[in-house]
Structure formats: structure tokens, C-alpha cells
Amino acid sequence: MSKKKKFVEAITPMDEDFAKWYTDIVKKAELVDYASVKGCMIIRPYGYAIWENIQKYLDTKFKETGHENVYMPMFIPESLLQKEKDHVEGFAPEVAWVTQGGNDTLAERLCVRPTSETLFCDHYAKIIQSHNDLPKKYNQWCSVVRWEKTTRPFLRTTEFLWQEGHTAHATAEESAKETIDMLNVYANFCENVLAIPVIKGQKTEKEKFAGAKATYTIESLMHDGKALQSGTSHNFGDNFSKAFNIQYNDKNSQLQYVHQTSWGVTTRLIGAIIMVHGDDSGLKLPPRIAPLQVVIVPIAQHKEGVLDKAEELRQRIAKVARVKVDSSDKMPGWKFNEYEMKGVPVRLEVGPKDIENNQVVLVRRDTREKIFVSMDELETKIPELLDEIHNSMLEHARTHRDEHTYTAKTLDEFKEIADTKPGFIKAMWCGDTACEEKLKEVAGVSSRCMPFEQEEITDKCICCGKEAKHMVYWGKAY
């Protein structure tokens, strides 16, 4: 095949093969390429630009809430990792080890960080002495390594980018508040920036983070009916501070253990954007996260005045949106398909007749709606339209989620829904891990969360018939 192969190629229809559709999108929209190391990915400029926008929005929120950025080493001594027993057991199967430096065998193995709790704890134990040193609210942007057996770009890779917040507080109440506050930051970001509706809730004992007192999550539903854990926030209580001896003198000069949290989101958010909003023509990017919000395509650009007018419009629109002119020598139809593939929210077409009529053709990526807009109105029309597109995409995603959320009152009903209707299943649970494991065995689903907004569907556990303690969202998940 020619190296100059056509950019715009047919995408496998999502209803035919969702996994292949997803792979086609990430490749053909030029988000990633596969790396030489199995399970790793090269994030290309367009994919990385989306991640940069995610970073920009979240980093601003973190700083507004009093957090500071730091950077920890990527290597963790084995002895440090083993200080918190539950934590090391939870990550042991995924850890990559460094055993040799140059030609010398290391005296102690070094773990390539799968997460950095132990490093932050070791640091906090050295710098926290007094109640005046608290709270400590740190965040780190970095990559982590988890030796995954099955990988897929953005969703599960051996190395991935993320942020991890780690905080230390004087009281249990403060750490509990921090955990929920940061979960709310994530939930608001998903809905107000990514146009992805989420369900907030607590993970079960079985599904919580290794070493945590409690784990909270935001869960979203993909187009194929599978759930995606889109962000987590963990309350450690004093579990880690006791293991690492992180103590401070309180106002009465009494030694107390700190209470800690950690919370994070990863590049899997890009996977969520693809799988919630994408269609058979490619990406469909929410305007607030799109690297390019408006593309101007000149029509008959060889004719006098067309490119000059396109550039004039670009300069005006640049005051209110991220915009570019595509003045390449490719055919307009090719450009239309390319920017649909890349999910650019708004396309403007401008040619000799449009200039004569002082108008442009405006096409929305989300609905394919085509309208004529006066050139004089673009600076006010574009921001309004971008907000309208965001709201429309959020509502569309929420409708899809709600239409694929089912309620089960009996085990037979639960199994039938799990077998025939992809989506969330709401059902009551007694709180026993044995019932949770049985539901996974008989229906192939996992508990996604115990939502903060509880409902009493019945008063009996869907599995054993004993008294129910929680309503749980269940589903198949990435």
C-alpha cells in the first residue's frame, strides 16, 4: 500500500464491532500510534492536545482549592512499597521491577511506580512535625507503569499519564471532606467540560483501593453499554500514616497520626470522550475540550479574495474560539471528512458566493445541521453555538445512559437483563462480598458503585434474599 494512503477511510461501524470501531477511531483521527513496547502507546500531537486541555482545566481547579504541584521519583525501593501490606498485595501482580543498574545487580529491587502513595508517605513523615504543617495538599502530573495483560489505547496501557493528588490532614473530618470535594471536582469537570454525565458513589469493600478506608468513584456509561470508572478519590484515614509513622504534635502537644487522601484521573478520560460521543464518522469532541473548536474551509480558494477573507474571519474568531484555516491543496470534500473524523465541533465554509452575500456556511459536527450565518455575527454566534453544542451533547449522553439503566427485583430478572440489555442495572444488595462475587459469576457483572443518591427498590438482597443495605449500580466494565 502506498505510504501516501488516503487519510479518510471507512471506519468499522460501531454496531458491527465496537472494539474495532474504537481502534479505527484512535488511529485514523491520529490520536495515537502503537509503540515498539507491547501495551504502550505513542500519544500523537492531536491526542496530546486533548490531554493538555484536560490538564489545563483540572490544574486550575486544583490550585483554586489550595493544592500545589510536586514531582516524586519514578522508582520506589521494595522495602518502602512493603510498608503497607494491603497496598503492596493489591499492586503486586502489576509491578515492573528494576533489578540491574548498568552492569551491577542492585542490592534492593526498585519498583517502577504504579502509584505514589508510599513515596508521598515517606516524604510526609519527614516534613510534618506540627499541626502548623497541616494540611499538606500536593498533586503530581506524571506517568505510571502497570504490567497489564490486556491493553487498549487510553483505556488500559502498560504506561499511562495521570495526575495523583495526595493530601494529609489533622482530622478524620477534614480528610473525609477532601475526598468528597475532589470527587466533586472530577464530576463537575466531566459534566461541564467533557459533556459526560456521571454517577457518584462509593466502591464496595471488594472494589475499593488497596489500603484505603473508603473509595469513591464517578462511573460513566459508554455507547456499547459498558461502564467506565472515570475517576476515583480515596480516604485512607490513618491506615498509611500508622504504617509510615506520619505524626504531628497537636495544639495540646499530643502526638497524633495524620489522616490522608489520594485521588486521580488518567488518559482514560480520552477513551471516555471517544466512546460516549463518537459515531461512525469519527470523533465528536465536546467544544470545551476540543483542541480546535472551529475550522474554516475555503471553497474555490484559488479565486481572488477567498483566502484573504478566510484569514480575516480567522483573526476575528480567534478572539472567542480556537480556530484555524485549512488552506492546503486538498479538495474541500476531503477536508470535510478529515475534520469530521477529528471531531472539530464547528466547520465554516467560505467561497466567492458567500463573500458576495456576506455570509458563511456553518456546519455542526454533533447534528450535521447546516445554516447560513452573517459574517458580521460570527463573534457573538460562535460562543453561543459552542455552549449549545456542549449542552446538546451532554443531554444526548444523559438520555442514552438513562435509557440503558435498568432495575432488577429478582435474580432471574437480573441475569436476563445482564444477558440481553447492555447498560447499568440497579439492584439491592446485603453488603456481603459472597453475594457480590456470586453475581459476577452468574451474570458477568461487577459492582460499579453504591450511589450517593440511594433508592429502595425492594428491602431484600437480589442475590440471597436477606435484608438489603444498599442499592448498587452493576454492570460490565472496561
Curated annotation (Swiss-Prot):
Q: Which GO terms describe its biological process?
A: prolyl-tRNA aminoacylation
Enzyme Commission number(s) from the entry: 6.1.1.15
UniProt-listed InterPro entries: aa-tRNA-synt_IIb, aa-tRNA-synth_II, aa-tRNA-synth_II/BPL/LPL, Anticodon-bd, Anticodon-bd_dom_sf, Pro-tRNA-ligase_IIa, Pro-tRNA-ligase_IIa_arc-type, Pro-tRNA_ligase_II_C
Gene3D superfamilies hit by this protein:
Anticodon-binding domain, Bira Bifunctional Protein, Domain 2, C-terminal domain of ProRS
Molecular function, one GO term: transferase activity
Which superkingdom is the protein from? Bacteria
Query: What CDD domains does this protein's entry cite?
Result: ProRS_anticodon_zinc, ProRS_core_arch_euk
Q: Could you list this entry's UniProt keywords, alphabetically sorted.
A: Aminoacyl-tRNA synthetase, ATP-binding, Cytoplasm, Ligase, Nucleotide-binding, Protein biosynthesis
* Enzyme class of the recorded protein, top EC level: ligase
- Compartmental location: Cytoplasm
What catalytic activity is recorded?
A: tRNA(Pro) + L-proline + ATP = L-prolyl-tRNA(Pro) + AMP + diphosphate
Q: What does this protein do?
A: Catalyzes the attachment of proline to tRNA(Pro) in a two-step reaction: proline is first activated by ATP to form Pro-AMP and then transferred to the acceptor end of tRNA(Pro).
* Membership in a protein family: Belongs to the class-II aminoacyl-tRNA synthetase family. ProS type 3 subfamily.
Describe the protein's quaternary organization and the partners it interacts with.
Homodimer.
Annotated protein name in UniProt: Proline--tRNA ligase
Q: Which organism is it from?
A: Clostridium novyi (strain NT)
Recall the taxonomic lineage recorded for the source organism: Bacteria, Bacillati, Bacillota, Clostridia, Eubacteriales
